[in-house]
């Protein structure tokens, strides 16, 4: 008997096709107003545009709108499973602005990224995945010893709409970070300019790799 992971099947059959449909047919091209909101988002997290000049930012689940372009002068590495489809079907796709693009899921380990990232960003992504713990485990490997992890995601308890295969809570996310070797520096609900990315409540953690003695 073949036993399949129902969460993975939902992600593969519904979530990814839904994401592709949204980005190709319904997502508006980024404009000045969206870039203003994106700046407000990162500044609300405590970052400025020049913080990572000459450093490496890894964007997990980057989508078609490359939020991490916010970091001027940084090397941007995008990890996006639908990258090839976005680049082929969306004329304005901002993945073209990334220095490197891996058309892979966040769950897949990319050995070339081990120990390279000064900052890993994962925004409005984890609730759309099939194995969040594997992603967090990979992020811990990708970070330099003094690197940071910015994780921000909507909590909404919705797993039956096809687009959100996993249910996340503030407790489960905090436990996941701690179990995968992180120390949490900041954690809070809501965003600086709105309650969530889409629905529910946004939860954000900023963390670093656990150091000896922590």
Regions found by a protein language model. Name each.
Residues 121:
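A conserved beta-strand element that flanks and buttresses the S-adenosyl-L-methionine
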Residues 150-174:
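Conserved class I S-adenosyl-L-methionine
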Residues 133-148:
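A short glycine-rich, Lys/Arg-flanked "PGG" loop and its adjoining helix->strand segment in the class I
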Residues 180-182, 186-214:
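Core SAM-dependent methyltransferase catalytic element
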Residues 48, 108-115:
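Short amphipathic alpha-helix with an adjacent loop that forms part of the alpha/beta core around
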Residues 1-51:
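Class I SAM-dependent methyltransferase Rossmann-like catalytic core
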Residues 124-125:
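Short catalytic micro-motifs in class I SAM-dependent methyltransferases
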Residues 58-109:
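Class I SAM-dependent methyltransferase SAM/SAH-binding core
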